[in-house]
């Protein structure tokens, strides 16, 4: 069937929920980093799970691919269509309702298009905490967070999106609706099917709603910004913090000195919490269920022990919420500062925590072997072994230097990933595979593991219509 006939049929079947003019499509065809731009027949905006199922049936009959999309905030090109054009983008933006908050069961159920910040606010209104927190929380969606198994800054205490999910509602590639929205913490009646869809990036099913865990809101919070001489000292500080704070340690971020300097350079009003420059910094936070006095006592004891052990060279403890927010501003503005500064090659990797210092040294040697003058910015959630290892050109680089870096991207990423693999790490910690890494994962996963993944994809989606070319390379 010609594309114009397909679009006419789509508009007739889903009146008022289909757009195909260029201006409406444009924001949905290019990814957040403006690295990938695709084509599509139309943008579908269903209002309900039943609409999604009907749309899947319609696409299946006509062999039209579907690219599910939440907030389109991903960093690996996972939610924008390819250049083929014989597809639709399925936006879940209209399906954004908070369906239920059960403060006694400590659960919340929401549609997949609910913005993460709105989910957090709904929990707060019930005097509860939904702890998934990341830089894009004002625009990313719950469905997208689950589809990519998002991490964020509090994984150390609460886990990834996968760990926070109790149930899902999913439309499968055959157009069936699976309602698994059970708010149970124990259910031993067979396979835990929801785990197949979490982190699958919409390749096995379209998440339409989810039931997630809530937690009591903490009575007090403590935040510190500490200077450390090297990454190994940061790892030692993490171990010390876990001893002193136990489960109340909620965040532990490592930021390299050059990364902090970049934020101070490009972010108006940003100030370093400590006066002297250092090679590395740690941003750590604890949440206490008892009282502010109890939290302060434990936190100050930790920092005193860290100074005595020569792990920390300088530190500031936030005395107000505003001061804590200013500490976090350094961390949250890093991606924006890098964008202002110029292009960079991003890596989202995870490692055994004990090998983080070793990795940073080895990866720097490997990268400089490919691009000798490259600047390297290191930051990330060291408490769970996740580093963002980004490579850029020297300050003041001209167009030829950026082109040289672009030309070397495959070699640079290969050098970084080879070091990750030697240390039993992962080339994708929290951002997903998308288009960026779909060609790389086969090199770093066992062949039988890739074969099992491909078998699962064929079982669920034999026609290959759900987010093709993501996670598993398209046939």
Please name every model-derived segment.
Residues 97-253, 466:
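FAD-binding subdomain of flavoenzyme oxidoreductases
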Residues 426-433, 468-470:
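Short acidic/histidine-rich active-site segments
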Residues 1-57, 74-106, 259-271, 321-345, ...:
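N-terminal flexible segment immediately upstream of the FAD-binding catalytic core
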Residues 1-31, 62-64, 305-322, 422-427, ...:
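N-terminal accessory segments
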Residues 176, 437-475:
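Activity-critical C-terminal alpha-helical subdomain
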Residues 23, 70-72, 135, 257, ...:
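Short, ordered loop/turn segments at secondary-structure junctions
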């Amino acid at each position: 069937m010609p594309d114009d006939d397909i679009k006419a049929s789509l508009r007739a079947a889903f009146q008022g929920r289909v757009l195909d003019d260029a201006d409406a499509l444009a924001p949905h065809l290019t990814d957040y980093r403006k690295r990938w731009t695709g084509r599509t027949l139309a943008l579908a905006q269903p209002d309900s799970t039943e609409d999604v199922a009907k749309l899947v049936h319609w696409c299946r009959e006509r062999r039209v691919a579907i690219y599910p999309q939440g907030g389109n905030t991903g960093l690996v090109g996972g939610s924008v269509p390819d250049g083929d054009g014989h597809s639709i983008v399925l936006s879940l933006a209209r399906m954004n309702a908070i369906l239920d908050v059960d403060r006694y069961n400590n659960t919340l159920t929401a549609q997949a298009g609910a913005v993460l910040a709105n989910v957090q606010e709904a929990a707060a209104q019930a005097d509860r905490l939904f702890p998934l927190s990341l830089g894009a929380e004002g625009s990313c969606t719950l469905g997208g967070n689950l589809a990519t198994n998002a991490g964020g800054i509090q994984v150390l205490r609460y886990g990834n999106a996968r760990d926070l999910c109790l149930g899902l509602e999913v439309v499968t590639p055959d157009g069936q609706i699976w309602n698994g929205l059970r708010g149970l913490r124990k259910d031993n009646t067979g396979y835990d099917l929801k785990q197949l869809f979490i982190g699958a990036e919409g390749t096995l099913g379209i998440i339409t709603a989810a039931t997630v865990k809530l937690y009591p809101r903490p009575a007090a919070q403590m935040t510190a910004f500490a200077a450390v001489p090297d990454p190994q000292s940061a790892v030692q500080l993490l171990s010390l913090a876990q001893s002193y704070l136990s489960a109340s340690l909620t965040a532990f971020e490592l930021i390299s000195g050059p990364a902090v300097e970049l934020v101070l350079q490009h972010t108006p009003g940003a100030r370093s919490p400590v006066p002297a420059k250092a090679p590395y910094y740690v941003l750590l936070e604890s949440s206490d269920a008892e009282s502010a006095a109890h939290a302060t006592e434990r936190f100050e004891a930790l920092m005193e022990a860290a100074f005595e052990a020569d792990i920390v060279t300088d530190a500031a403890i936030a005395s107000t919420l505003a001061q804590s927010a200013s500490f976090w501003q350094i961390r949250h503005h890093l991606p924006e500062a890098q964008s202002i500064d110029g292009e960079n090659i991003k890596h989202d990797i995870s490692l055994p925590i004990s090998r983080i210092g070793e990795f940073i040294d080895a990866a720097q040697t490997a990268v400089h072997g490919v691009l000798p003058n490259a600047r390297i910015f290191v930051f990330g959630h060291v408490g769970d072994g996740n580093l963002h290892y980004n490579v850029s050109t020297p300050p003041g680089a001209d167009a030829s230097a950026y082109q040289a870096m672009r030309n070397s991207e495959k070699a640079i990423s290969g050098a970084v990933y080879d070091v990750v693999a030697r240390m039993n790490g992962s080339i994708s910690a929290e951002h997903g595979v998308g288009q960026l890494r779909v060609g790389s994962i086969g090199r770093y996963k066992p062949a039988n593991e890739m074969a099992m993944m491909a078998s699962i994809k064929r079982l669920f989606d034999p026609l290959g219509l759900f987010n093709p070319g993501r996670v598993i390379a398209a046939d």
